[in-house]
């Protein structure tokens, strides 16, 4: 039975719900871009993208501001991704390149195109994670990130195949140590338990051992004859177990025929993945993962039957399709279930959605593209702001990713508690109140002594009628909260912040219009307008509702 498509109204509430789950936040510009389109048209555009990113560039210096004091092999303003670190263990260069990668990734999310690429890249990073503390190699981190964003909406078998032999994953889960003489079960176990089938799905310990033997012989190279090279995947036939591999009844008693020669690893890996994908539990597991990321952590019995089951069937029917994940996501995001009232506002935002969504919503200014040094500094500040809020992107807690996407029964509620709320709240306030400043001793003269801060007046001027305090409050509620708030709370916000304790709306209207007419006005009340707006929005940011989507 196919999943039930949504046939109800597709107005602003439905559009904002879809965009909040598909993008990092929903800005007034996002909303204006899609308004008037049908649901199918919006989802088609969200799923239409390529990996057209440009690589990170060297915009860093040593601790003294000297561009030649570190990573001198890479010219300032050029990319480092195609230059091996020499020597390999130069931790100073590794650190600055990792920070460059972090800033680059943050910049892509902050400046995301209006499609699902960045959200899906985060999804797969959580599902197929590596930790920078273990894979302490910037080129490997960059390569895997590019692999995820290139394959994020494509064919699942191809993606899991590519990740399995990617140097970052070979290193992270000991694949490079998995040899015929001493099989290492680490990756095989996680392949079954975390990446394709799920714990307790029915595979046996003997299946893990057999899969480990299938995967023997894969390794990677980061130096050649003592000279550092870019990470390269290799298959070394002498280290591969050439005997047959027997699997249990869970896998229909499949026997993967042992292979020899240079193609043995590729042949057996594909046979292993075909065997896994033939098990119905694989399709259900992946669809549950997508559901928990885009819809809700807890999956009810009804959702399992009416959503997961049909999506899994669609997944299996398109097992060879190059856009398999896009097909499944399109069905999910256009389903009746996705737009049900119970799903709207039911999830706690992860810290990336929270912080990047606010940076986008308030249009935090960023330096011109040519000012690579200033842009790097701003993006890196925002990367650490996201980490402060609770999600250091390069440091998922373990190979299972973040607990909010797998830990029953709390799931996304784990993001928000008495310990995390102050940090999350401070991060939101930092976006509205804070500024990022660049130092005087930059390499690029144009990157020196700059300050970037949200233009709160420019933000409210995007709203329907910011001079009308009632319209202003209504528009802010619509943008900041998924669910409406009471008229009494709206009235309280209006009187406390906009009317200065007065009764008539004219007090705000006159002050706002006076400031807009002349930002240098001598009207003392009008001079306070930008501060009043920050106070108002800052107070609205503190509400628990701000953390839901």
Report the location of each language-model feature:
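N-terminal accessory alpha/beta regions
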Residues: 28-149, 497, 503-518, 524
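Active-site substrate-binding loop specific to GH73 endo-beta-N-acetylglucosaminidase modules
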Residues: 1, 72-88, 98-105, 137-377, ...
């Amino acid at each position: 039975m196919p999943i039930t498509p949504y046939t109800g109204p597709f107005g602003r509430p439905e559009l904002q719900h879809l965009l909040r789950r598909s993008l990092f936040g929903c800005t007034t510009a996002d909303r204006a871009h899609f308004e008037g389109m049908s649901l199918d048209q919006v989802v088609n555009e969200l799923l239409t993208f390529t990996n057209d990113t440009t690589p990170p560039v060297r915009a860093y210096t040593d601790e003294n501001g000297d561009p030649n004091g570190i990573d001198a092999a890479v010219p300032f303003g050029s990319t480092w991704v195609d230059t091996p670190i020499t020597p390999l263990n130069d931790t100073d260069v590794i650190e600055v390149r990792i920070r460059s990668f972090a800033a680059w990734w943050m910049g892509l999310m902050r400046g995301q195109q209006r499609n699902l690429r960045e959200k899906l890249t985060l999804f797969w990073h959580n599902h197929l994670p590596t930790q920078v503390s273990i894979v302490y190699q910037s080129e490997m981190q960059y390569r895997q990130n590019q692999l995820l964003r290139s394959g994020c909406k494509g064919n699942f078998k191809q993606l899991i195949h590519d990740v399995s032999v990617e140097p970052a994953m070979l290193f992270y889960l000991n694949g490079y140590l998995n040899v015929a003489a001493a099989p290492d079960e680490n990756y095989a176990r996680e392949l079954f338990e975390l990446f394709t089938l799920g714990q307790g799905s029915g595979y046996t310990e003997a299946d893990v051992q057999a899969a480990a033997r299938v995967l023997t012989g894969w390794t990677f190279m980061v130096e050649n004859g003592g000279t550092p090279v870019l990470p390269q995947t290799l298959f070394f036939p002498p280290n591969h177990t050439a005997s047959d591999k027997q699997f249990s009844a869970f896998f229909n008693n499949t026997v993967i025929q042992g292979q020899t020669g240079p193609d043995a690893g590729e042949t057996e890996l594909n046979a292993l993945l075909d065997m896994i994908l033939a098990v119905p539990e694989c399709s259900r597991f992946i669809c549950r993962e997508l559901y928990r990321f885009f819809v809700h952590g807890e999956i009810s019995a009804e959702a399992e039957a009416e959503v997961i089951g049909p999506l899994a069937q669609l997944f299996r029917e398109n097992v060879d399709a190059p856009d398999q994940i896009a097909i499944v996501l399109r069905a999910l995001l256009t389903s009746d279930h996705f737009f049900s009232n119970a799903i709207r506002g039911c999830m706690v935002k992860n810290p990336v959605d929270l912080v990047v969504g606010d940076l986008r919503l308030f249009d935090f200014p960023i330096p011109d593209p040519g000012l690579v040094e200033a842009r790097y500094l701003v993006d890196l500040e925002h990367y650490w702001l996201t980490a402060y809020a609770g999600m250091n992107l390069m440091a998922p807690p373990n190979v299972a990713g973040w607990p909010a996407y797998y830990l029953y029964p709390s799931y996304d509620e784990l993001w928000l508690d008495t310990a995390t709320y102050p940090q999350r709240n401070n991060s939101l306030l930092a976006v509205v109140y804070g500024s990022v400043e660049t130092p005087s001793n930059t390499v690029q003269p144009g990157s020196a002594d700059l300050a970037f801060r949200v233009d709160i007046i420019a933000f409210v001027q995007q709203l329907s009628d910011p001079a009308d305090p009632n319209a202003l409050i209504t528009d802010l509620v619509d943008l900041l909260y998924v669910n409406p708030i009471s008229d009494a709370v709206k009235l309280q916000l209006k009187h406390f912040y906009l009317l200065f304790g007065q009764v008539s709306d004219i007090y705000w209207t006159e002050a706002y219009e006076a400031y807009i007419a002349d930002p240098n006005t001598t009207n003392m009340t009008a001079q306070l307008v930008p501060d009043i707006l920050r106070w108002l929005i800052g107070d609205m940011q503190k509400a628990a509702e701000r953390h839901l989507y």
